[in-house]
Every structure is written in structure tokens, then in C-alpha cells.
């Protein structure tokens, strides 16, 4: 085997892509800070049980596992940063009231989520802890859309769902709850034949409700259909009211209701949302409410948040990260060194051409040059 080969669905990030990713990362983190979010940096490696406190079997299967040579315990390479941030809020910060946290870092998956998906993603996201009201859901939803607009994406569609609908159906039908994982997979994949097979022997009301969910997709008027087709349970009524409220607050994106879009259902407890753009089959960002995630760390708090993969966003973003630069010669000249240093201190990119290498790669847009005129170093257009 060639020593330069990488594992399947793992790739290096080359300069032009890395520069674009870093430009987007800085934009998003600066925007999160403008909303009052504090940065945290959880470790890439943790004890396995700490990483798998939520997320169900799907997260367990996606997590790389290895043995710690120090303690002998099983470790995991994180596949999702959300449980880690919940641990920080619950166990380390232990604050009262509202806490806003954000993060950015790599996550690793044992299997790719799609045909061309990378198994190493650069996850960036934001979370609010400590407020159970829809105001927190609305802020996170707006921050996610704001972040996507900052990346230059257009014609964003926001799909809304609610974990409370399925939870209410399972709570009143034990047989349905027992096959919950299989039902979730059938609904998420909109596999109607499999869904029909799984619901054949359930109670008539539960069967009809579960089979209706894949059809409850469209604009906000779908909520009226849902009220008519789903059981008149208080939990379902509240869930539909929540979705109606959140949908009405969105002013800068198309809104769709999809009551079968149950990505991450295993740890969500309320409103869920995913963002889509034209030409990309999978969601470019997703999030929702997960009030019980911190329970495993001794302190369950209301929580909602979102995340996205910066590598995927950089691939589809029209943002141009090739900034202007200044080309300077390489000389043993104190005045030149001082001029270059002053320009860099002022935020300029200055590239000094090494002897015999006067050309500059297209990676840099050197639209100006630092030249010597009458004993002084000045900037001129190129």
C-alpha cells in the first residue's frame, strides 16, 4: 500500500479550501459572539460512556472506539459535539439561568452519511441552556438562518418537525413504543411499505396517525391537516401550536412542515428543524430542542441548538476567500523590514518573494506591490 493513501472518505484540506473554511469559521464565530455566545472547546477524545449518553444506537454506531493505554477503559472519538457541550453546561459551568455556548471542531464518523460525504467533519454550532420557552427555539432558529446567510447561501428552506408528536403516539401505545427504532427509521426514510408492515397490528388510531406522518409535508397549512388526521392529544396539540408559532416568525427563508423528518429523534424532545438549499440533497444545517441530554451528567436543563458541517458549507458556498495581498521583495533592508511589519500589524497580507521566485501563485491576489521610491518604501498598484 502506498504510504500517501488516506482511508476511505477521509481527505486532506488543501490551501484554497482551508482558507475558505477558515474565513467562514471566523465569520460564524464572530456572529455567534455578537449574539452573546461563549466559545467552548471540548476534547476530541473522551470515555465512551460520556459520549454516548444520548443519541441512541445511531450515535453508538457512528463513534470510533479504542482502548486507553493508560486506564484500560474504552475511549471514543466524538461523532457529535452536542453531548460534550451539554456536559460542560451541566457539570463544569453549573450556572443558574440562561447560558449561551458555541463551538467549532472536528468530529469523526465510522461510516459516511452519504455516498460522497467525508467521515471527518468540521462541526460548528451554538446552544442555549436554561430556557424552556419558545423564545430560545426562535433565537436558535434565527441564528442558524443568519449564519447560513453569512456563508452566502441563497433560497434557504427551513423544514420544521416536532419530536413531541411521535413521543405522544408512543406514550399511549406500548406496542408502537417497543418497535420505536424501526418506526423511526421507516419514517425518517419515508419508507411507506416498511411503515405499513410495522403498523399492521397496531391500534387503529395509532396506525392511522403513523401512516399519515409521511404525507404531512408542505407549507404551514399542513398543520391544519395534522390537527384533523392525528389524535386529539394535548401533547400533539401543543407540538402543532409550537410549530405554527415558530413558522410564523421566519421572515428570510421558505418554511415547510415535515412531520416525518425525524433526524436525531433519539435525543430531541421538542421542535426540530433542518435547513436545505437548492442543488444539495441533504440538510446543510439542523438542530432542535433536547431538554434531557444533561440528565446523564446530573443536571437536566432546557436546551436547544443547531450545528452544521463547515467543510460541506465551504464546498457549496459562493463566498470568495481569496483576499488582496501586497507583493514585496526580499532584501536585507531595515527600512523594508519595518515597512512590511507595519503593514502586517495593520492587517495587510504581505508576501515577500524569495530570491529566484518572483512569481506568486494564483492562491494570492497580489494587486499591489511594495516598491522603493526615492529611498522610501511605498505601495503601488500592480
UniProtKB/Swiss-Prot annotation:
Pathway: Amino-acid biosynthesis; L-histidine biosynthesis; L-histidine from 5-phospho-alpha-D-ribose 1-diphosphate: step 1/9. It holds the Pfam family tRNA-synt_His. One of its GO terms (biological process) is histidyl-tRNA aminoacylation. Signal peptide: none annotated. It is found in: Cytoplasm. One of its GO terms (molecular function) is histidine-tRNA ligase activity. Belongs to the class-II aminoacyl-tRNA synthetase family. HisZ subfamily. This function is generally fulfilled by the C-terminal part of HisG, which is missing in some bacteria such as this one. HAMAP family: HisZ. Heteromultimer composed of HisG and HisZ subunits. This is ATP phosphoribosyltransferase regulatory subunit. It comes from Burkholderia mallei (strain ATCC 23344).
